[in-house]
């Protein structure tokens, strides 16, 4: 079992990583006998895990209700979140309830925002079931829903009280979803840890084969890196923005193509290549390092260019609505070397457009 802590003073919380956690009531602490909980999951995951998690909580004496939402990024909306509020009010659940987010990034983000909003804030536990949510979105307290004009534009910072990572969930994960999660894994190596990036180059096949030892180390290292960043910059005033490498380009792809048509990790993968080409054009990143990123993404089964039907100009309106934009200045996370990155403002639009063109036209 791997266990680490996100250190945020009184709001610190544990991350527990192991196979078989769903069978142990202690995994879901601080829930205890007599507590009330609302399990939030989706139609795909409910047949796989809902009864197991409900049963282990009920064995611990927790009073459990559940709400099952439709599955997909397109349902990460205010309208669907209202379904959660209705379920909470109908039971009813008070301010002492705990929401349990049983799912991937969509369920985690939506449930977290519902927890932040319901009766001005209730506890919630993250139980991430996808690799992407296990290494990234479940840690750090960013919660949100999408708006037709932008991804994650309506939300709040609201930390969970615990993160429960059961490695067995990855056994039911479609290959495309596994690859999507590996995009965020690779991102950590690019922005923060060159040694981890090299480890990934040597172990990507083991991760794709769901080798338990390799996967446990991978998830722990990603969570360690994110926990360090969140502890230093919870509200994303500086350092935490580095975790958005590839996301400004990637969110543009997701919004333009329609939420759910490109998985988040797929869009981020293409966005990382665009960010690398942008940094190359600014003279601060080596072409051979861009190629290392491309090669690793391809080995992980990820796209290394954006949609062919999306012009370079189509990116800019979406990118100018990015949350990192300040006073009309598009700020981008750019790699400086494998394991080092910066948040840079004042990047000329012609450089960005050229980098997108480089990505789309390259013989990769």
From Swiss-Prot:
Catalyzes the conversion of 3-deoxy-D-arabino-heptulosonate 7-phosphate (DAHP) to dehydroquinate (DHQ). This is 3-dehydroquinate synthase. Binds 1 divalent metal cation per subunit. Can use either Co(2+) or Zn(2+). NAD(+) binds at residues 71-76, 105-109, 129-130, 142, 151, 169-172. GO terms for molecular function: 3-dehydroquinate synthase activity; metal ion binding; nucleotide binding. Belongs to the sugar phosphate cyclases superfamily. Dehydroquinate synthase family. Keywords: Amino-acid biosynthesis, Aromatic amino acid biosynthesis, Cobalt, Cytoplasm, Lyase, Metal-binding, NAD, Nucleotide-binding, Zinc. Zn(2+) binds at residues 184, 247, 264.
